[in-house]
Amino acid sequence: MAAATSVPVKNWGLFLDGQWVSEGEPFEIHSPFDRALVGKGFRATAAHAEAAVHAAQRAFEITKKMPSYERQRILRAISEGIHIREQEFAQLIALEAGKPIKTARAEVDRAVFTFAVAAEEATRISGEWLPLDWQPSTVGRAAIVRRFPLGPILAITPFNFPLNLVAHKLAPAIAAGCTIVLKPAPQTPLTSLLLAQVIEGAGWPAGGLNVLPLAIPEAERLVGDERLKLLTFTGSGAVGWALKQKAGKKKVLLELGGNAGVIVHSDWDADDAARRCVEGGFSYAGQSCISVQRIYVQRSVYQEFLTALVAGVNKLKTGDPLDESTDVGPMISEDAARRAAAWIEEAVAAGAKIETGGKRNGSILEPTVLTNTWHELKVACEEVFAPIVNVEPYDDFDDAIRCVNDSPYGLQAGVFTRDAKLLFTAFEKLEVGGVIAGDVSAFRIDHMPYGGVKDSGLGREGLRYAIEEMTEPRLLALNLQ
């Protein structure tokens, strides 16, 4: 395995109450590609967590009164600050997450957009004028409904999008006037700390953002802390639902796992659908909750689609994430790649066929296409979170819908058809948070509502929708007589 391009190793402190604090248990972050040292930091203690909550409470007295134009200005400055440091962010994401550099740049661009949209939404948190004269006894009465920020919130983020999924917590919180205690993923905390530098420079008040790499016990104590008014969590279903039980009275926003299905009907160009499924299934080694995992193709075009899909997958280049030509880098760890390879072996032992891929080299798993799978196999019924897709034929469109729905998850699904009736049938019957027409499940633009049903979570992200989660309506009833 060739070595990744070396970069200077930086020491990172905690970001606590507007200060960079070099305290706590030291840790090192290593590249999942070649185990090269990427950076060093400190794991926060229970005392740091307590200080962060106090800081967030104190800063909230400032942010809840901050006018919308000022929140807009800060968010625009954050967006511009990320853009100015695009290469620095992209390289750090590639190193600590193993994401191919060109994919990392796309993530940075998305984060720039996320904060820019949040800046506009900060000025659109509107209220409502509500007439109350619906009965004779209430003539002359009316009401105003206005949204107020909840207060300090707790954000827990995953490794796979260490910038943009953090942005999806921080940007709407700042737009709403909430303060934040952020626990980044232990595999990728450095990108969050770099983002904290940008937010600090943009003028968000001290204590308004606290970034603490925390061990699980300290993080769980924060989850149960009633001074934090909302938990926004993105990660695995098992962890998310367990945290919900510990969250007490606070609001909970969960963006959890997926097992995304795609339907390819015969009236859509098979080559085009295959091309999109290659990108949607193997970008960032399939480590996204909306990555294409299960593909159901109408039998009349099944072989044509499969041939095109395998040809496209075989063109993908695996390797060093800092190499501009790399399409698929490592998984987040060798253990993760080993687990995914074991699932492939289990499927093959049960009769599945490897059409391409299937081999592992350290943390890199070859992009893999499986056929002759069925629901009970782990590669089909669980979230694979790896560069693996299953392709199966169907005869009747309703059967394809039933196959997609035969999952504990319901995040997004893709439907390739030009038949409007079939499309709206899918829209009505698919048990998911989002149906993507003419594209794969992995499509997401950052201002759209995003979230799932069943085991895939609670609530919605996507700036305006997250702001609604982070604010609460308050009524002023008026007697105007």
Q: Can you say where each PLM-predicted feature lies in the sequence?
A:
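Conserved C-terminal structural/oligomerization subdomain of aldehyde/semialdehyde dehydrogenase
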Residues: 36-40, 204, 228, 263, ...
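ALDH superfamily catalytic-core signature
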Residues: 9, 238-374, 397, 403, ...
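Rossmann-like NAD(P) dinucleotide-binding subdomain of oxidoreductase/dehydrogenase enzymes
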Residues: 130-272, 394
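Glycine-rich loop-to-alpha-helix module at the N-terminal edge of alpha/beta enzyme cores
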Residues: 36-126
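Short, well-ordered beta-strand elements within core beta-sheets of diverse protein domains
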Residues: 38-44, 58-65, 154-155, 262-265, ...
